[in-house]
């Protein structure tokens, strides 16, 4: 059995760069920048600070950014939890979005035609 590394370090960097588009879009309140990270058919689900389950198409995120604006002081930590040649799971811990809310996100990414895209975002928002 060959002892080969299936995923190059550069792929981790590419995954993080994709997620960084999401973060920088939040920081600047820029939906076009956020959209660089997400597949057009991406979905998102999660719990709001009041415990209500929210979900649906990624356009809900764009509406949220339109409503609450930029997050110039946002703090984040990004961890690639798992990666294969075509899939990845990333955790984003963030403090201080445009509404002042703290979150933990889990993003599932697929590599489409050589480009990483987030296809699903699940989140937990804290009070």
Language model features with spans:
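Terminal "cap-and-tail" regions of soluble proteins that handle hydrophobic small molecules
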Residues: 2, 56, 115
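Residue-level signal for short amphipathic helical patches enriched in basic/charged
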Residues: 29, 97, 113
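Short beta-strand edge/turn micro-motifs at domain boundaries
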Residues: 102-127
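Residue-level recognition of short loop/turn positions
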Residues: 41, 50, 113-115
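Short, low-complexity N-terminal intrinsically disordered segments enriched in polar/charged residues
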Residues: 1-32, 36-40
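Short beta-strand segments enriched in hydrophobic/aromatic residues
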Residues: 38, 94-96, 122-123
